[in-house]
Every structure is written in structure tokens, then in C-alpha cells.
Curated annotation (Swiss-Prot):
Function, in words: Binds directly to 16S ribosomal RNA.
NCBIfam families: S20
Annotated keywords: Ribonucleoprotein, Ribosomal protein, RNA-binding, rRNA-binding
Homology family: Belongs to the bacterial ribosomal protein bS20 family.
Protein name: Small ribosomal subunit protein bS20
InterPro entries per record: Ribosomal_bS20, Ribosomal_bS20_sf
Cellular component, GO annotation: cytosol; small ribosomal subunit
Name of the encoding gene: rpsT
Any one Gene Ontology molecular-function term assigned to this protein's record: small ribosomal subunit rRNA binding
Keyword field contains rRNA-binding: yes
Source organism of this protein record: Corynebacterium diphtheriae (strain ATCC 700971 / NCTC 13129 / Biotype gravis)
Single GO biological process annotation from the record: translation
Record carries keyword Ribonucleoprotein: yes
Length: 87
């Protein structure tokens, strides 16, 4: 446990940020999972709609600093590739 007052505050701040990041990351992963399920089911219309939702969630998480922009771009690219393979 920290003894310095500012470090005690940082511990609290870091915990809040960790929980916020965890919630955002979990939501993004859920959207990606839904996209993969739509692709696996062979439902192209649902997959296209879910790709839009997942991409938007990824972009929002990048602006909040949860994912690195290159990591999000990679995930979006892989999802687009999976969607294009369905055709």
C-alpha cells in the first residue's frame, strides 16, 4: 500500500480507469463475437449490420484509449475479410 497521498489517489484513479476500460473492452469483444456468430451462421445481411456495429464500437474504444488504433484497424480488417469471403 502506498504511503504518499498522491499515490493513494492514483491507486483509486487507476482502479476506476481499469474498470471502465474492462467494460468497454468487454462490450467490443461481445460485438465481435456476435459478428463471428453471424458469419458462422451464413447470414450475410446480419453479418454486414453487425460489422458496422462492431467497427463503430472499436472506433469509439480507440478514441477512449482502450485499444490502440492499429489493433482496432487489424480487427476491422479481419472482420471485413471474413465478410468478403462469405460472398
Amino acid at each position: 500500500m502506498a504511503n504518499i497521498k498522491s499515490q493513494k489517489k492514483r491507486i483509486l484513479t487507476n482502479e476506476k480507469a481499469r474498470q471502465r476500460n474492462q467494460a468497454i473492452r468487454s462490450a467490443v469483444r461481445t460485438e465481435i463475437r456476435k459478428f463471428r456468430a453471424a458469419v458462422a451462421a451464413g447470414d450475410k445481411a446480419a453479418a454486414e449490420a453487425q460489422l458496422r456495429v462492431a467497427s463503430r464500437a472499436l472506433d469509439k474504444s480507440v478514441t477512449k484509449g482502450v485499444f490502440h488504433r492499429n489493433n482496432a484497424a487489424n480487427k476491422k480488417s479481419n472482420m471485413a475479410h471474413a465478410l468478403n469471403k462469405m460472398a
